[in-house]
């Protein structure tokens, strides 16, 4: 198992915070991995004491998105509700350039951006 994924899995083994993140208007979070399922991102954020988190909804370095399973998304949303994790921020992939002067690249960027919005 790659080292970074092992670390991500280790976070899931952490005990729940002794004191849940405070429920204030000020939120602090991290960009967390969706490795092992999108629902794990919410669990990781909670376990380290965050009140918000950010994810890539698909690979940040590829045009071709992968589908997120509806049950996993529902589970993530249930965990967000349970742990009061909000907002969830979706980071678009690195390839998107909505200012491109290349028509082909702009079309791919537009399609990828729309996909990100739909997954959000």
What does each model-identified segment do?
Residues 1-92, 96, 100-118:
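N-terminal pre-domain/capping segments
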